[in-house]
């Protein structure tokens, strides 16, 4: 193989004590634009400054390579363990394979800033990819993130596979794969989490969000479309999927082979009404909100792992069009809260659909904001739609 750059040749120690970020960055700089591969051998690499990957760059890590965020450095907005280099004008053809990528959160070090709205605050995310065409992430062991493990926006063409999440300590807003807006044409497959993780949304499709929150600095709102998700496994995550749309569309999403134990939601489509930074306030969106369409969910098994008073495992408080679930199963043998509704649809006037269980079809029609439909227990298929015409 040509143009392989071993970071040891650029001066890394890999002993976990010295700051290896300058040496690794020299290797990344040498690879940029030359279809170069930066090889990171087994070792422990303390990273004191953000690593930046530029155009036409591949990073390949030995399975024994661990890179972690240095706890000794003061953090500021724009700091990460790894980011693409140019989030404004964009990058192309970036690939990262293998290794452990550690946010080094233990409750004492690398803590989330106290002021959620500090415009200069560190986001707390571990990996950052914004404005990238052709991104590949494969075989990454993501560990101990302060907030989002991997945050992304403005992606055009991506493959994310064989990603695992684990943390010694749970943290607030500890999303797994967090997508902001303007994301399209992607494949996500074989995503796993150890019990307890992720401690927020395992996969978040947030076409809309509050951009003044520190977690979302320099992300954006916008359409999320044409994505296939295959093979998502968690024994006890906070929430499996969030689909957050208020004004921007989420469409043409295919999800297959989902196996989730959830403390809160399997699929949350509440429009962020109940967050600390709600996007919909009382008196707004009286005709319904959101734009989620052409969603296919095939072979989903879910169960509740904690009694917490949540409204349902699948919560739809958003306008939906052609949202279809087939091969659904609620694992009642493992479910600790069987009385919790499986499906709840509300705050979506002019919504209609069907739920089929053992050949019996239940139809629903919501005429006003006050109307609600709930289904308890398991079901085989569900078809959810909106009567609105502005999709």
Positions of the model-derived regions?
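Extracellular/periplasmic carbohydrate-active domains that bind, remodel
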Residues: 1-391
């Amino acid at each position: 193989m040509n143009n392989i750059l071993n970071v040891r040749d650029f001066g890394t120690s890999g002993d976990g004590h010295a700051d290896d970020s300058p040496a690794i960055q020299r290797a990344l700089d040498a690879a940029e634009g030359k279809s170069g591969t930066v090889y990171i051998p087994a070792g422990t690499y303390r990273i004191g400054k953000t690593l930046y990957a530029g155009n036409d760059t591949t990073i390949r890590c030995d399975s024994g390579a661990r890179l972690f965020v240095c706890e000794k450095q003061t953090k500021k907005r724009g700091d990460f363990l790894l980011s693409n280099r140019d989030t404004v004008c964009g990058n192309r053809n970036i690939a990262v394979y293998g290794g452990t990528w550690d946010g080094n959160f233990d409750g004492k070090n690398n803590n989330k800033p106290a002021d959620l709205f500090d415009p200069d605050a560190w986001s707390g995310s571990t990996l950052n990819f914004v404005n990238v065409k052709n991104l590949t992430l494969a075989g990454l062991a993501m560990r101990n993130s302060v907030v989002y493990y991997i945050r992304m926006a403005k992606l055009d063409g991506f493959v994310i596979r064989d990603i695992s999440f684990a943390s010694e300590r749970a943290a607030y807003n500890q999303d797994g794969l967090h997508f902001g807006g303007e994301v399209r044409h992607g494949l996500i497959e074989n995503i796993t989490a150890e019990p307890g993780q992720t401690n927020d949304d395992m996969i978040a499709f947030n076409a809309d969000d509050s951009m003044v929150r520190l977690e979302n600095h320099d992300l954006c709102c916008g359409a999320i479309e044409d994505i296939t998700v295959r093979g998502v496994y968690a024994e006890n995550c906070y929430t499996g999927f969030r689909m957050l749309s208020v004004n921007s569309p989420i469409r043409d999403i295919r999800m297959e082979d989902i196996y989730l134990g959830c403390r809160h939601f399997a699929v949350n489509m509440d429009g962020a009404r109940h967050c600390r930074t709600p996007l919909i306030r009382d008196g707004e969106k009286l005709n319904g909100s959101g734009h989620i369409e052409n969603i296919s969910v095939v072979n989903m098994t879910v169960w509740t792992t904690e009694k917490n008073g949540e409204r349902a495992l699948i919560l739809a408080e958003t306008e939906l069009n052609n949202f279809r679930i087939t091969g659904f199963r609620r694992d009642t043998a493992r479910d600790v809260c069987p009385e919790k509704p499986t499906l709840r649809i509300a705050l979506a006037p002019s919504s209609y659909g069907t739920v089929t269980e053992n050949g019996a079809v239940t139809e629903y029609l919501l005429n006003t904001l006050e109307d609600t439909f709930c289904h308890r227990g398991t079901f085989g298929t569900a078809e959810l739609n909106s009567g609105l015409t502005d999709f």
